[in-house]
Curated annotation (Swiss-Prot):
Keyword flag Transcription regulation: yes
Entry binding sites for ATP: D175, E176, V177, G178, L179, G180, K181, T182
Protein name per its UniProtKB record: RNA polymerase-associated protein RapA
Cysteine disulfide links: none
Domain Helicase C-terminal: 443-597
Entry function: Transcription regulator that activates transcription by stimulating RNA polymerase (RNAP) recycling in case of stress conditions such as supercoiled DNA or high salt concentrations. Probably acts by releasing the RNAP, when it is trapped or immobilized on tightly supercoiled DNA. Does not activate transcription on linear DNA. Probably not involved in DNA repair.
Span(s) of short sequence motif DEAH box: 278-281
Organism per entry: Haemophilus influenzae (strain 86-028NP)
Family stated for the protein in its record: Belongs to the SNF2/RAD54 helicase family. RapA subfamily.
Length: 923
């Protein structure tokens, strides 16, 4: 059928878009606007997956003005349809097709049944189960949290859930090293992407961390970012195209933007929804002279709605630098440094009261006064009485209520998340082994002997350069046939993947991984617990980064750290300074770089010449370093903000969230569904044992391509622990693109839309007709409203007997399906033709019955949306009165969302999605 502007068409692959209208045409493409979803699609005219919508005489037509009427006649003029319709006021009016409502209930299942496109009964079952799973996943509070390739760390899950659910979050992530700020940022981002709150993301990082972020986003979150640099952008300059508009997920370096102001202008014009800045503490600021890098990020942060800053802890930064970060997030709130300092002091006495509440101590009069001053709008006297009572349950409830109220009103608690190792339990110990050798050349012999003594252990060796790592691999292979993998920054991501997989293989893998000091950035090897520092890192931050490859949450054993050095060498003195001065091998040292800077001149002498300092002078350096470190440590402990820690780690709620995901990990539901999905689609499965399978495409699949399935096949696992150890495997969860897109493939396609089956039942007369009808209740609304959390596509199942009675509640789906037998396609087609009149009558009956089942679902969704959005608005309005960190713009957006959401839910409708005709026989 030829296209014409103004015609109405339906997308066969995206029914939820509603009824579209052609807005533009050329020889090769057709452009269609879908008003219900406010989306535009461009299709190749020759192969457009579209269905022309033509209504017939006698059908009901819905006008975009909201009224409905019966069609009396249809006329075609130059390819456009004009309908003569009787209005509710009994008037005959002509309706052009462009005026038809974009929200349409369209039953393709019936068309497929009567046009001999009948599927197998098992395909119908897959479709119904898929629809049920789709609904459950949209409603799940774990959506966007469970799919990360990472251990279930409560504080990370808490931050991801808390920040990810906000509208346009602007926060500072300031956890200590090793607590997973990158993972937190990725989980927040994934949560926002899943909820369709953001679509376009810009990540700005130091140049050396670009590949680390690229790897982390892909391996942990299945997010495909693009690296941008000058060479890539130059390709678009000739076409006068803004390069930042060519991709949705972009990573670039801060240094590149600094040196190319024109690229900053292009980034500002690219309408990003979310900005993430790593190492934000390097953005130098003072009131009189902010740095160029700071001003650059400030420009972007002003116009991009969501901002995540990853930074060192406030204690490491100092107050002024910490204020500068907060100023990027909310310049109106944090406008003056001295005002900020005074406000912070106001909260210090409250921290002491929090300590008493946490320790179940009685509150002093002074502590009560401080709490009352901060909670002026709340009558806290009943809570104080409950705390002083003898009722343990009342005491606990009152303490928790007070703590929560204080957290909500904390000066920066809503914007700042900072966890410390002291506040987060579960870390292993670090055990330092100093290996003193006679000569520098003895290192290789020592390493070979060490590897031979620990043949059953995985050993991670860090060298200064890639060249050293490559040389060592050759020596180990040629001299002792020791299996070693090499890992360095000159390798491609795929090559590093292979090396990591070779090292991770517990049966036939490498015993040792030889890595350059920066080659392993972004990679974690918790399955190994032995670290050899063949060359010492040149500063404390690099040292912590190297140890952090093994010493992370999730490490099950104590980390053994071996440092081989020649006696009287610069390296052994540097090792002693790290150990005796900083205690940096066996503990994290937040003040390490500050001490490194303070003693930089002396350390330069140590590194360049082992005799530049006498033994007495070196001993004095160790003593001074230790003294300053202890002093700084005491100051840091005094400044501990328990209120902030409580807000950051999530407490019992965070643990409950982790437990929920663990329970889902252990459930067989996903495994059963995925294997059935692969089986019916025609994906080949090869069981590898050890909780993993290889899936490969075949020439007999029901679809041309299965999402995420490579031609050479993919190894997948449903086991979180195995996925952490084997990065080359895909970790399948309900959030994985392969599962989500597999669900979409079935739900939005034609698989199982119309089926027929035989029920052998001696108690029913032969030829008895039953029909199973699956309707979908849904809202065709703009994605940004995220109405799927209130009303996801919801299946309603009817099972009608030959008299039109719904017996679905008496006969469960799985019970019925297990008793059905397949019918040959020719027989099925003949029976449909013979019973067409009865089938049509039963479908009409189903259309009448479903209304009473669908309307309560829509009403419940409206009530849920009203309650949830109103509660959040009321909470934020109450908090804004006492905590200026609540932005009025955030409340305004929520109020707009509430009004628009209720309006869209009122327009929700239902449609027949699929059906199964069942015929009985005695045998």
């Amino acid at each position: 059928m030829p296209f014409a502007i103004g015609q109405r068409w339906l997308s066969e692959s995206e029914n939820a878009l509603g009824l579209g209208v052609i807005t533009a045409l050329d020889q090769r493409t057709v452009t269609i606007y879908f008003p219900a979803a406010d989306e535009t699609r461009i299709y190749a005219a020759a192969q457009a997956p579209l269905s022309r919508i033509v209504f017939s005489k006698g059908e009901t037509l819905s006008h975009q003005a909201g009224w409905q009427g019966e069609i009396l006649d249809v006329q075609n003029m130059n390819g456009l349809l004009f309908y003569l319709v009787k209005t509710p006021q009994d008037e005959d009016v002509i309706v052009q097709e462009r005026d038809i409502s974009p929200i349409i209930s369209f039953s393709q299942a019936k068309d497929r049944l009567f046009s001999a496109q009948i599927d197998r009964s098992s395909h119908f079952a897959l479709r119904y189960r898929t629809l049920c799973h789709q609904q459950a996943q949209f409603k799940s509070p774990l959506r966007g949290l469970r799919g990360t390739r990472a251990g279930l760390i409560p504080h990370q899950l808490h931050i991801a859930a808390e920040v990810g659910n906000r509208v346009n979050p602007r926060v500072l992530l300031a956890d200590e090293v090793g607590l997973g700020k990158t993972i937190e940022a990725g989980m927040i981002l994934q949560n926002q992407l899943f909820a369709e709150k953001v679509q376009r993301v810009l990540i700005i990082v130091p140049e050396t961390l670009q590949h680390q972020w690229l790897v982390e986003m892909l391996r942990r979150f299945n997010l495909h970012f693009s690296l941008f640099d000058e060479e890539r952008c130059n390709d678009f300059d000739l076409d006068a195209v803004n390069p930042f508009m060519t991709e949705s997920l972009i990573i670039c370096s801060l240094n590149w933007l600094e040196t190319h102001p024109n690229r900053v202008e292009q980034a500002l014009d690219a309408q990003f929804d979310c900005l993430i800045v790593d190492e934000a503490h390097h953005l130098v600021w003072s009131e009189s002279a902010p740095s160029a890098a700071y001003l650059l990020v400030e420009q972007l942060a002003r116009i991009i709605p969501s901002v995540l800053l990853l930074t060192a802890t406030p204690e490491q930064l100092g107050q002024e630098s910490h204020f500068a970060r907060l100023r990027l997030l909310d310049p109106e709130r944090f406008f003056d440094y001295q005002t900020f300092v005074k406000e912070q002091k106001r909260y210090q006495p409250v921290v002491n009261a929090i300590e008493s509440l946490l320790a179940n101590k009685a509150l002093s009069a002074v502590e009560k006064n401080h709490i009352s001053d901060l909670l002026l709008e709340q009558d806290v006297e009943p809570l104080f009485k409950a705390i002083a009572s003898n009722n343990d349950e009342e005491q606990h409830r009152a303490r928790q209520e007070l703590i929560q109220a204080l957290i909500d009103r904390h000066g920066t608690g809503r914007m700042l998340f900072r966890n410390t190792r002291q506040g987060v339990k579960g870390f292993p110990h670090r055990v330092y082994h100093q290996i003193t050798l006679s000569e520098e050349n003895d290192k290789i012999d020592w390493l070979i002997n060490f590897l031979k003594l620990h043949r059953d252990e995985k050993i991670f060796v860090i060298c200064q350069t890639a060249a050293t790592a490559i040389q060592l691999e050759q020596i180990l292979r040629e001299r002792e046939a020791i299996r070693a993998a090499v890992f360095h920054e000159k390798m491609s991501i795929i090559e590093r993947d292979r090396a990591a997989a070779y090292f991770a293989d517990l049966e036939n893998g490498a015993q040792v991984l030889l890595s350059s000091s920066i080659g392993s950035e972004g990679r974690n090897f918790q399955f190994a617990a032995n670290l050899v520092l063949f060359d010492l890192p040149t500063n404390p931050d690099l040292l912590e980064q190297c140890i952090g490859r093994l010493d992370r949450i999730g490490q099950k054993r104590d980390v053994q750290i071996y440092v081989p050095c020649a006696k009287d060498s610069p390296q052994i003195r540097l090792a002693r300074w790290y150990n005796e001065g900083l205690n940096a091998f066996e503990q994290t040292c937040p003040m390490g770089m500050a001490l490194f800077s303070q003693f930089e001149d002396e350390l330069e002498k140590v590194r360049s010449n082992s005799t530049a300092l006498s033994e007495n002078e070196f001993s004095e350096l160790l003593k001074q370093t230790k003294t300053v470190r202890e002093k700084l440590k005491i100051e840091l402990e005094k400044g501990r903000d328990r209120l902030l820690e409580l807000n950051s780690n999530g407490g019992k709620q965070a643990q409950a969230l982790a437990d929920q995901i663990a329970d889902e990990d252990n459930s067989p539901e996903l495994v059963n569904f995925a294997l059935k999905l692969f089986d019916i689609i025609g994906v080949e499965q090869e069981d590898l044992g050890a909780n993993s399978i290889v899936i490969s495409p075949t020439g007999t699949m029901l679809v041309p391509d299965f999402p995420g399935l490579k031609e050479e096949g993919v190894t997948v696992t449903f086991d979180r622990e195995l996925a952490l150890a084997r990065e080359e495997m895909e970790f399948l969860t309900w959030d994985h693109p392969m599962i989500r897109q597999g669900i979409d493939l079935v739900a939005s396609g034609d698989i199982g839309k119309a089926a027929m089956a035989l029920l052998v039942n001696k108690q029913l007369p032969a030829g008895t007709l039953l029909i199973e009808l699956i309707y979908i209740v849904e809202s065709q609304s703009p994605k940004g409203l995220q109405l799927n959390r209130f009303l996801p596509p919801t299946p309603i199942r009817l099972l009608l007997d030959n008299k039109g009675n719904n017996i679905g509640e008496q006969v469960a789906f799985e019970t019925l399906h297990s008793k059905l037998k397949p019918l040959g396609k020719n027989i099925a087609n003949q029976m449909v033709k013979m019973a067409r009149g009865n089938i049509e009558a039963l479908i009409t009956r189903g259309d009448q019955l479903v209304k009473s089942l669908a309307e309560p679902i829509i009403t419940e969704a409206k009530n849920q949306a009203d309650q949830q959005l109103s509660a959040e608005i009321n909470r934020l309005q109450a908090l804004r009165a006492v905590n200026q960190n609540i932005r009025q713009s955030e409340i305004d957006i929520l109020e707009q969302q509430r009004t628009q959401s209720l309006d869209e839910l009122s327009k929700a409708n239902w449609r027949l999605d699929c059906l199964r005709v069942i015929v009985t026989n005695k045998e």
